[in-house]
Every structure is written in C-alpha cells, then in structure tokens.
Amino acid sequence: MSKRVVLAEKPSVGRDIARVLGCTKQGQGYLEGKDYVVTWALGHLVTLADPEAYDVKYKSWNLEDLPMLPKAFKFVVIKKTAKQFKVVKEQLLRKDVSEIVIATDAGREGELVARLIIEKSGVKKPLKRLWISSVTDQAIKQGFKSLKDGRHYDDLYASALARSEADWIVGMNATRALTTKYNAQLSCGRVQTPTLAMISKREEEIKQFKSEPYFGLTAMSESVKWTWQDGKSKSTQTFEEQRIDELMRALKEKPLQIIEVKKAEKKVYAPGLYDLTELQRDANKRFGFSAKETLSTMQKLYEHHKVLTYPRTDSRYLSTDIVATLPERLKAVAIGPYRGVANQLLKGKIVTNSSFVDNKKVSDHHAIIPTEQTPLLSDLSDKERKIYDLVVKRFLSVFMKPYIYEQTTMLAKMGQESFVAKGKRVVSLGFKEIYHVDEEEGDGLANLPVVEEGTVLSHIKLIKTSGRTQPPAYFNEATLLSAMENPSRYMNQASSEVVKTLKETGGLGTVATRADIIEKLFNSFMIEKKGQDIYLTSKGRQLLELAPKELKSPELTGQWEKKLQDISNGRLKRQQFVGQMREYASQIVHEIKGSEATYKHENLTTTKCPTCGKPMLAVNGKRGKMLVCQDRECNTKKTVSQLTNARCPNCHKKLELRGEGDSRMFSCVCGYREKLSTFNKRKSEQKKQGSKRDVQKYLREQEKQQEPMNSALADALAKLKL
C-alpha cells in the first residue's frame, strides 16, 4: 500500500502533525505510520551556491572580477544540516511513497524551503499542499481534509525563487564591489540600504531643526483651567511673546464670561486585531522588546505552546471561515485575568463586523488571534506571557462595546479675547474594561463642573505659558517598523503609482523579514542604540555616501515588490524579472568602480587584533561594546562590555558587564561597581531569603483576583505549609 510523505519546516511542527496522523514509529529524523511518513527540514536545507561554485576565481574578492552573473543558478545542500537533508531525501525517494504533502510554513518563504529540497532530491512525484494558520490538532485535521494541489502554488514558488536570486545578484555584487573598492566590510541590499537611508534622513531633519520659543496664556478660575485661543487661527500658541504680554496687561482684573457650553457624546472603537508589525510595535513601546525578540517569542507561542496563530501575517482581519471557530477560541482564553470578559461574551451572541472580518483583506494568513487551545499560563515565560496578554486583550476587545464618553467644550470671553476649556466624563468603559488603567494613555481632560451659558467668573488669575518647538524624535524600533511599513514620506518625487504599490505590498521588506533587516543593521554595525533611540554609526553614514543613489530609495524596492507580486499572481515571468536584476547589478558595479570617494575608519583603536595583529575597531553592538578586526577576511570579534538585565541596587538602571573570566565586573553609570562573583553570591542569598515571602505574595495576588488562575504552580503553592 502506497504512502504519503509529509514535509514540515521544523521538527516541532513535524511531530505535531505525526501525532495527529497516528505516526508513532520512530525513525532517525522522521516518524512513520500506516498511511503517512512525516519528516522535517530545519529551516532551509538547500540554498543558493556561493560565487566560487561558478568559478574558482570568485573565492578571492577582486573588484576586476565583478559583476558576477551566473547563467543558471546552482543550489547546494547546507553543510551543517546535510544529515537531515539526506534523511528527507531518502523518505521522498522511497518506492512505497506515491505523493508528497508540503507542510512547511504557509507563505512565500515556506514554499521555497520545501520546493528547493524536493528539486535537489530529484524526486518527481505529485504534490499536495497543507495550508494552515495554526498547528493545533483541530487545525491540522481540518487542513488534511482540504489539501490543495501543489501546482496551485507554482507561481508563489516562482516569486520566492525570483526574490532569492535577485537578492543574490544585487546583494553579492554590490557588497563585493563596495568592500573591495574601499577595503572595509560594507554590505548593502534592496531593503537594508533604503532603511538605513530613512534613518539618515531623520537624523538630518533633527540636525537641521531650529527650535523656536512659543508662548500662550492660561486663565485660572476657581475650578477650571481656560486656555487662550487666537480668534482667527484658533491656535493656542503664538511665537510673539510681546502679544501675550500685551494681552496680560489688557485683560488684567477683567471678568470671564461663558458664552457657549457644548456637550457631545463620543465613541472610540477597539483597535484592529494584530498583524506581526503592529504587534512588534506595541511590544517595543510597552516592554522595549526588539522586533526580533517579539517574532521569536511569537514563534514559540505558535509552535511550542500552540496558543496563538501563525505569526508572520500582514493582515489585521479574519476570513469568514474563522467566524465559526470564535466561540471555541473565547472558551480557550476564559482563564485567569480574561475569564470574566470572555465568559460575558460567551453568554450573548458573538457579533462580528467588517472592522475585523473581511475576506478581501486576508491573503495568505488572517490576523494573529488565540487558537482553540487553552494555555497553562504558568508554563509561559515572562516574555511569552506579555505577548500572549497583548494578543488576547486585543482579540477580546474587538467583540466588546465602544468606549463612550461625553466631551464638554466651554467657550468664554475676556474682553474681546477667546478662551476655551475642555473636559470629559466617561459614560461607558466598553472595550477599555479589559485594559488596566495604567495601560491607557491619558489625554489630560478632567471632568468639568456644571456651569451655564452666561455665567460670569471673576478673580481670574492669568499665567503666561511658554515652550519650545521640538525636533522629530529619533527612530526607535517601533517607529522604524512603522516607517518601513509606510516609507512614502521618505521618497523624493515618487510617482503616485509607486507610492500605491509600496502601500499594497507592505512597504520595505515583509512582516517576516523586517526584524531580520533591523537585526542585520545592528550586527553589521551600521546602526547603534543609545537608550531606545537608533543612531547611524560612522560606518553606516559613509556607506550611504558610497552606495549607488538608486539603491538608497524605497522606490526601487517598491517596484521590485510589485514585480514579485505579479510573478506570484502569474502576471510576470520569473526569468524576465531576474534578467532585469542582472542589468541592474552590472550598472551598480560600474558606478562603484568609477567612484572617486574614499572610506575612513573613524573608530580605530590602539588594540591589536589577537589573530592578525592589525588595529581593531571600537563598535557599539546591540547588546554592548565590542572590538572588531578591520580586516574583513580576519573578522575577529571581542566583547568589551555587555548590557545585562541585572539592575543596579542603587539607581535600578541596567548594569554593564565588563572584563573577562573571573575578573568580570558589573558597573553602572551612577558609579556602582561589583564583581560578578560577589553579585552571584548576593543574588543567591537573596533568593534563599525571599522564597517564603515570594510564595506568600503570590498567593495574596491570586486571592485578590478572586478567580482561579489556570496554573499548576498556583495549586502546588496553595498546599504548602509555610
């Protein structure tokens, strides 16, 4: 009897599928059952060959050998995972296997992972595609009931292959040209270089910004703060200090008469469900998580815990077929702090609307929402708990009523000058009930006293206010993600068609790649962090001066993404696009070769490289200070200091760990110093002393909630006799 081979992207997903399909016989790198053999990749097992695979001369980096334009691309098995490739290949080629089910991640990159393995194995068997957004048992069972013909995804594979080949052609040639021309480790690409250019443009805006003083006028009555308003512009500020001074003299001791009281009921609806970029933004704002941290945490919640759906989605909507599963998902999250709201929603009719259910706005995957699987909250790490909390609250909020408040606007006159006072009264918390008070950003509007039109107030105190105009803020990871998603304001003379394309294709990069792009810029020392703010390094600034102009614009990436989209929709041939990339790479190399610019290492130190003896470069890595060899072929790196999560006992700021071996020492900007060995000893003693107190504190918190938390730890602690 013939069998099907199921190819998953990772072992964890493969084992989940195998369990559902009844594959219990353990093999080396696979599981087998009566009808199925389930095996898995380890991410990519096959990749594009390095340049030296086409010609041995490319093993050495020489400017005169560029551009490198292979007639046909070669693919090689990745050495470190070659053993697993052999296992997968053996299963695919088995004589008792008649069909292959591709069960890699449902997206462009997942398709590429599987197809390259299948092609490199030389197997020619019918393909089926498992396309699911979560890896719960229920989702897997449903997915296998509705497998699609693999040929349906041929264009998606062509698009993925075109993206991979184009990045090789442009990235390899541009990076080698810049590196050999200027003898420095310089890399560029179609997404990372325009991202770098946006950071540079923001820094230039800040540098060129000229702060100006502005002034205003506040009138204080007994219980209301009134703000002066220009009669024509309605602005509450002016750059003319003399005008405010004159108003203070003219209005001194004059009464204030209320001429109008307006009340309006306002509704605020819950924000949309999360896609990956929105979740990364929120996690960075609230917890300081990097984009990479959020994605890897989401991946664990999806793959290991199976409590959230597929993370790499660019949609904030659900498709109509998901609506029937919503009650089960609400039951799954009816635990701990979410129990009350979830059960309340389950009592009534679950109402959906086009604000979060829309088939037209879902492509490969719907928004990130909880699965039908109930988590054991105590099994989640601190980061996992925080990300899960964000997603569950956002999910619950879309079913809840809007936040309603009554806004009061009072207009008054002092002489001929207008003053305004605004306040609000909460009518109904609505969806904000799910959020704690300290999680909500206040708007500074207090509840105003009840007063009638025509009321005259005396004994008014006038106060001159002042401030200065502020420059744009430096990018942090949250705002940089927003800029990558919508880069149109950083484009010069871009056509409306290109702007539209960038909007349709999701901007620079994809939801799946943006975190890696930002991480790559940090790891190649093009950018660095100061606090939460992102700054260009000297290396990043010089790269932008040396890189071809066209490669720095988001416009080029927008054009490419549109073409890749056309390939996936069957409107453009892959070969045509790759041919255009060959021409572009030749143009880039020609431009770099002809440049007369120079590159200067501005961060040279007197420390010699322990490997080659050349002076090392001082760089600020994402997690601390490092020394890096300037020789690109040597590439020796040495950690000088590392920012840790340990807190200073004096000022509670994060401590920096310096030195090597037993002599390592924690240091703080406040001047605090402590040896690592002393720190570890102190922490160990604190842990012993605090264990009883910590348990009692935990139990008190559980009693406060008055609802049982879904936690094995809570049950165990309750039985302890302290």
Language-model segment annotations:
Residues T238-G272, Q280:
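Metal- or metallocofactor-binding catalytic centers and their adjacent structured scaffolds
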Residues Q28-V56, T193-Q237, V398-A446, Q580-E583:
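Structured, non-catalytic alpha/beta "coupling" segments that mediate domain-domain communication
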